[in-house]
Amino acid sequence: MVVLVYGCSDQTNLSSKSSESTDWELVILDSIQVDYLGSVGGGDFRNGKGVFFNFQENKLIEFDSTGKIHYERSYPTDGPGKVLYPTQLRYTDDGRLFAASFVGWLYELNRDLTLKQEITLPFPSQANDGGGFFRSLDFWNDSLISYYPGRDGANPYDPYFIRDHFLLEKIDSKTGGSVPLIKIPSTSRYSSDKFFERPWIQFGISGTRLHLALSNEPMIHVFDLNDGGSYLHTVNFKPSKFLDNGEHQEKYQYISGSRMLDGAIRQLFVTEKGTVVYYEEGIDEEIFVQNELNLPKNFPKYKDFQKQVLKIISPDTILSNEIIVPYRIGRIMNIEGLDKPFYALRDDDFVGEEQEYITFYKLLLVKK
């Protein structure tokens, strides 16, 4: 797919294409520059404003759709007012901002990004990784929904964690009280007693439906939040290429990244009119070994041997075409609706340009 470039004035015509088509393309409408020099380690964008996290400074930066910075806030890592690595960021519809660190701390922030409160659960999270642009924090019906493993001492690195435990917590942000939510359905191979590569868990919510994905299975599992998170159905989004290293002979084997690279869901966006899956295809063993892609110095070469793809699943489970995303487009901040523009980080390393600002592409999904 070729990414088309249109001026902003063309947006109305683009959005008015036939509603019957299942073929889509990705259009770059514009770009904005945020006058900040630093890395982006997680973020969100909703209702005309965005926020991103800079790891080196333990800082959040909030900006608007013109690129203007409204607030910058660095946080102490100990003592009063500490906020530790708030990489997961989610705005609510009414403008509240919640954050989670990659090791489980949960926060609510004021509109000027100062700390409003730390949300403390009765038990600690046992997670030691994750965060960033993974989608594992959301808000529904006055409750936070979070991937927060640790209830009853559950270890998320146990090979049967996904099979044996609830995967999410529904959290009262005022009290820290929580109830467990969502069990993996039998449609997932992780419900069995076999061993597989450890996946990342992501989810999103639209209305009363929660959609959950494990990163190395091409499936979306759908649950009803109005019925305590009961399982409804599973959709296989049928990628034409999504490599997988299969069943392991013993636990704690890590094959992906050492001998080959699994296909992986990188981001998941759930909207009223459809779910968008952003995934990478993976790299087979022969290419991986020949090019020594297990070495950190060669990690940037991954982009030479696999594609990154968007695919849309309609509410009635009709699948779109595969929309190839060029690598100059990096992680997506959020997709609020299939008919709304959204923002994605420009990959300056891939483009080969060093700038003293951060560029976000303004994008739109358009039916052909």
Task: Label every model-predicted segment.
Residues L14-G38, I318:
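A short helix->beta-strand "capping" segment at the edge of beta-propeller domains
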Residues V27-Q33, R73-K82, I119-D129, S178-E197, ...:
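Surface-exposed loop and turn segments in beta-propeller and other repeat-based domains
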Residues D30-N58, Y278-E280:
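Beta-strand-rich domains and repeat architectures in extracellular enzymes and scaffolds
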Residues F45-N47, Y91-D94, F139-N141, I205-G207, ...:
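Residue-level detector of Asp-centered blade-edge/turn motifs that repeat once per structural unit
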Residues G104, D112-N141, Y147-Y157:
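Asp-box/WD-like beta-propeller blade repeats and closely related beta-sheet repeat scaffolds
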Residues Y147-R163, E280-K303, D347-F360:
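Short, conserved, GDST-rich strand-edge loop motifs in beta-rich repeat architectures
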Residues Y160-T175, N294-D316, Y357-K367:
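Beta-propeller blade signature
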Residues R259-S314:
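Loop/turn-rich, solvent-exposed surfaces of beta-rich toroidal or solenoidal domains
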